[in-house]
Amino acid sequence: MPSGQAFAATAVITPLADTYITQQFPDGNNAGATELICGAQGGMAGNARNRPLFKFDPADSIPQGAKITGVRFTIVITKAPPAGIDSRFGLRRVLRDWNVTQTTWKLRLAPSVAWGAQGGAAGTDYSNAISASALISDEGPYVYDSTAALVADVQSWLDDPATNFGWILISDQESQAFSARRLASANHGTDLPALEVDYTLPVLPLIESPHLEQGLFSLQFDTEAGYCYAVEFRDSVGTGPWTTLTNVCAKLVPEKVLAKDPDPVSSRVSRFYRVSATGPAR
């Protein structure tokens, strides 16, 4: 991409892992299930609650330093009861780690790391706030439209993968029989859950006006609002680590930045500089 030209793209991401935990079989692990269950099934299962878990890896598809601008989450309901109760299925950000081959209604990590409460505890295991919700009724696809919270979740996972514990899906009528629906999992073969992520990369900074004055080298470059930049140098063109000269964040408006190297030119044989966008400003 040429300097000065912005870049926008959309990535479609399928789950890195998904499963569901069920109150009906509190010690059971459902890794590899082709369908996930959300809500209470009724019948012989009674009012036992079911909660799917999803984990996506945006860093595998989206470059570091990207700014997330939109997120849409799609699920496909594969089975609905004939007289089912409609409800809103809410996505909540998970706050603690879980393992797809170990997690159960009781445990998030085997053999003994429990959820804060069985099935997960709001405020401890998952967020009190709902990142997005959709009214679920009949079979078919459902799209969770982009919200500020969905964007913030995915941006956080991209910037700091160590915070990525995914989402839990909870029906707002999960205590009511026949609120449950089955949905295709990552193992379904078709109709997989999907995360559609819009993102932009900052305008590549163009170094302008390299200048030598009183034995000191300086350079200028234009920033884009909402991004941070690093000015770095090293004394060999091909080898050795880059050293940070300065970091700049332009949070509100674009601006022209002057970066000056305090080391006199006379103290070295050569020096090479680069300017890079390091990510969205916070």
Give the location of each predicted region.
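Sec-dependent, cleavable N-terminal signal peptides
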Residues: 1-9, 281-282
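Flexible, small-residue-rich N-terminal segments that precede or flank a structured functional core
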Residues: 7-61, 172-174, 186-192, 198-200
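Beta-strand-rich interaction/scaffold domains
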Residues: 12-17, 80-156, 163
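A short beta-strand element within beta-rich, extracytoplasmic domains
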Residues: 56, 67-80, 195
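Acidic glycine-/aspartate-rich tracts in secreted/extracellular proteins
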Residues: 59-62, 78-82, 95-100, 151, ...
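Exposed beta-strand and adjacent loop surfaces of beta-rich binding modules
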Residues: 86-90, 192, 226-230
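Ser/Thr/Pro-rich, low-complexity mucin-like regions
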Residues: 150-189, 199
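Short, composition-biased motifs enriched in small/polar/acidic residues
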Residues: 201-282
